[in-house]
Amino acid sequence: MENVYDIAIIGSGPAGLAAALYGARAKMKTLLLEGMKVGGQIVITHEVANYPGSVPEATGPSLIGRMEEQVEEFGAERVMDNIVDVDFTDKIKVLKGAKGEYKAKAVIVATGASPKLAGCPGEKELTGKGVSYCATCDADFFEDMEVFVIGGGDTAVEEAMFLTKFARKVTIVHRRAELRAAKSIQEKAFKNEKLNFMWNTVIEEIKGDGIVESAVFKNRETGEVTEFVAPEEDGTFGIFVFIGYDPKSALVEGKLELDETGYIPTDDNMKTNVEGVFAAGDIRVKSLRQVVTATADGAIAAVQAEKYIEELFAE
């Protein structure tokens, strides 16, 4: 099986990189298939303070850069190609990319998930420049500033409360007249003196020249439009969007079992419903999506893939 890899990994975020590292260290012929953007969501994170052992000056790109170095040190092959189709029906799995076709004994799907966008003008252009989708990652950049949180579910309210530890004022902007978060979470939120609420309101536009400088909001009931401008002493403010995630699972739809929201269910060993196919990182059904959990998933998936190969392909 000269042209067949032992392990092929789709996705090059922390989960995919960790899987490649563990696969290569185990002397598996390992292929890391990267899309056009290496590193996943973490590359837009300025600082990574919650990854165990990270140095104070660690950034998302620097952490990913070190992971890439380790992957190369242990001999994993890296190919930049967008996988457009997969065939998991046979013992040897086939992955079809824009640049070529790849075959492997085991496949690890680590395609990740993307935060849902608010969908207003200026959002994409100012992501990482005041617009964020991760309070844990970026809260301290808004120390003693004003912050707006878009959303009204559990995550939005919990992240808003976390942000009150840093910001002087946090305003939850919710399109409905009441929160969707669990009652216990709401009770805590309403007792927090630094939390404010804009009901029946949506964000219409985010403005700024290289940094968030103002935001336009519209009341869905009255039609009233208001614009918040960054206080002169701050120069900017934060906009955190928490309206859910979109799993990047279109590639495996109809090929693997997905839950009702599009995530891949696995067991504790990262096994999917298809023999020889594993899933790791944010694409999985899981309770916490962080760099540390993604790398753990990747490590487990690679180790289990190795065991699967040794059992099924034993000479």
From Swiss-Prot:
It is found in: Cytoplasm. Signal peptide: none annotated. Coiled coil: none annotated. GO terms for cellular component: cytoplasm. Keywords: Cytoplasm, Disulfide bond, FAD, Flavoprotein, NADP, Oxidoreductase, Redox-active center. GO terms for molecular function: thioredoxin-disulfide reductase (NADPH) activity. This is Thioredoxin reductase.
